[in-house]
Curated annotation (Swiss-Prot):
Coiled coil: none annotated. Part of the tripartite ATP-independent periplasmic (TRAP) transport system DctPQM involved in C4-dicarboxylates uptake. Keywords: Periplasm, Signal, Transport. Belongs to the bacterial solute-binding protein 7 family. GO terms for cellular component: outer membrane-bounded periplasmic space. It is found in: Periplasm. One of its GO terms (biological process) is C4-dicarboxylate transport. This is C4-dicarboxylate-binding periplasmic protein DctP. The complex comprises the extracytoplasmic solute receptor protein DctP, and the two transmembrane proteins DctQ and DctM. It comes from Vibrio cholerae serotype O1 (strain ATCC 39315 / El Tor Inaba N16961). Gene3D superfamilies: Bacterial extracellular solute-binding protein, family 7. InterPro entries: DctP_fam, TRAP_DctP, TRAP_DctP_sf. Disruption phenotype: Disruption decreases growth on C4-dicarboxylates succinate, fumarate and L-malate as sole carbon sources, but does not affect growth on sialic acid.
Length: 332
């Protein structure tokens, strides 16, 4: 049965009606969690707020979590250094942000590899996906849980329906060699730019377009300074909740086990809701007057064919076995 948008929104917002950063008591282990999104409309922000609530209720006296959203403490380009320095204990950067720690996560940037978020979930839950969490252990970074955002769409200051429409345009990308290659493959000019700078870049026409999820496009108001957004679903934008191996190994066993259990339960609950949150943000954009375009099957196939060579370029870094496992995850 159809639910009014306001009722769906209310059910999602119900989990985010929490207090600001907690006041920790003496003797409690302080867990600072820095991230870059809002707290009430973004999958990561909602999950972080729920995690904070549960830790502070269920681990009261043992541990205390403080969440710092909207890049108020660190942006994703600096948070990993802060993590290794012990200035924060938890972060959840996008998987594209781990380039200097491992090349394995490049698999998540390959265009049109995953059919949908459910396929991503199956891959991350597989043995190969579990192995990826430990890909940075030697560098002092421990992966804990994968968090979903959603599939990426393309927006620009002109209509984009086929790859040729993007030729010559400047697109903001994360600091990922795969994403650079993706836009170069279709004749566009990729520009590495931080999340926080992207709206200004679009507004001042330093860049012409960008790729992102519905929640980021709505939450950062990119749709206000673009001609429209094309629903390409060409890639996944996900996060990895990480901590420093040193901090994690130094926790008392009971604290570590209880925290890991809570984090896993929050992950399962919120990942199951990610598609609903993304669809909600898409509708927010439409209701606000934003233009959303869809592709015909023939147009989509043009994108798939144009971007397939990117896979071959990075297969050696990623591993053919991982790519095969990802493709297998598309089979339900």
């Amino acid at each position: 049965m159809f639910k009014p948008l306001t009722l769906i929104a209310a059910s999602i917002l119900a989990v985010t009606s929490f207090n600001a950063a907690a006041n920790c008591d003496p003797g409690e282990i302080v867990i600072k969690f820095s991230h870059v999104t809002n707290t009430d409309k973004h999958p990561k922000g909602i999950a972080a707020s729920l995690l904070e609530k549960r830790v502070n209720e269920e681990m009261n006296g043992k541990a205390c979590m403080q969440v710092f959203p909207n890049s108020t403490l660190y942006d994703d380009d600096k948070v990993l250094e802060a993590l290794l320095n012990g200035d924060v204990q938890l972060a959840a950067p996008s998987l594209s942000k781990f380039e200097k720690f491992t090349k394995k996560y490049r698999i998540f940037d390959l265009p049109f590899l995953f059919e949908d978020v459910d396929a991503v979930d199956r891959f991350q839950s597989s043995a190969k996906g579990e192995e990826l969490k430990n890909a940075m252990t030697r560098r002092g970074v421990k992966g804990l849980e994968f968090w979903h955002n959603g599939m990426k769409q393309i927006s620009a200051n002109k209509p984009i329906l086929v790859p040729a429409d993007a030729k010559g345009l400047k697109f903001r990308v994360q600091a990922s060699d795969v994403l650079v290659a993706q836009f170069e493959q279709i004749g566009a000019n990729p520009q590495k730019m931080s999340f926080a700078e992207t709206y200004g870049g679009l507004q001042t026409k330093v860049i012409d377009g960008q790729e992102n999820t519905w929640s980021n496009i709505y939450g950062q108001k990119y749709f206000e300074v673009q001609d429209g957004t094309t629903e390409t679903n060409h890639g996944i934008l996900d996060y990895l909740v990480v901590t420093s191996s040193k901090w994690w190994d130094g926790l008392p066993a009971d604290v570590r086990d209880q925290f890991a259990k809570i984090l896993n339960e929050v992950t399962i609950e919120r990942n199951a809701e990610s598609n609903k949150v993304e669809e909600l943000n898409k509708q927010y954009i439409i209701e606000a007057g934003g233009v959303v375009r869809t592709l015909t099957p023939e147009q989509r196939q043009q994108w798939v064919d144009a971007l397939k060579p990117v896979w071959q370029k990075f297969e050696k870094d990623i591993g053919a076995d991982l790519i095969e496992a990802a493709l297998a995850a598309n089979q339900k």
